[in-house]
């Protein structure tokens, strides 16, 4: 009798090289290894040990975490922090020395790795993608297994094109119905985290399923998988479907001709089999979800915009009660305050979660004809997104409203 497999099972089996201990870690093959300016020490370690990058064509370097988003005509010299400048330059030097592909600060397709990779079609169903950044979970939107790795793992992957990984448990989150107008994938994932908690997905790979998930665009799916780690999950995944294939068909690095037909046949075999089992299940009704706002400092400290700041003293979980009290003090909020009455200090539109063209279109539609009353900046996720937005006149909408229009980078997420 054939065992019903999940999407994750299939990818795991395809990439497992060895597993000396059935209950221990497995050695997995890595299709793409993504690095940014931060893990320069991994390249230093290789150099000191006399080793080279095992497969340079499968390591991709992105200048994104510490690149300046203003005065870009000056290149890395525009970075006010000498350490940041050095890391940007080191990445370029390491990429040149090891012959890996590098989207540097002056590259016409420069941007945040988790925006550039998908828009170029580098992420494809069935792949295993590792990255020196926790939001590598983004690639799960394509039916790939994407996850972040630590310092020593980056060096190991550079040297071997493989990684030791303990098999996680599996969770399925099924979202039925449809999201209401004005409710986004960001609201959906915040509602999920608010329900299951920031540790609710710990030790699991999450597969998102259901009619509401199928109705999402690829960019919305990326937002969902990008934030799956915020509930402690090792990765978030969505089975590939016609929406996935249509998106990839337009991408630069997608297979072409006969290779496309062969890839498509393989991709169609990946969705979880009927009857496949999961270690945990959660169900949500998309129609009941409203726009969400985080009132604290963790993503599970979230309530609908129509709600009020809660009183942590009423929380039954002692850890959440303590965290909530600390968060309220930090945020200078009082229990019972209506969220709609809370003033904001500044606005940031961007990041690998929401710096894509759909996000900018949505934001511009709300900003048009209005004026910002607080400092506000918009940072497109990539140069391609920036050019597309400018071609549509979105930059003018933001600028006329008093927003700063900047160059791509991680920006406020990394303090750069």
Each predicted region: which residue ranges?
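Fe-S-dependent hydro-lyases/dehydratases of central metabolism
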Residues: 1-416
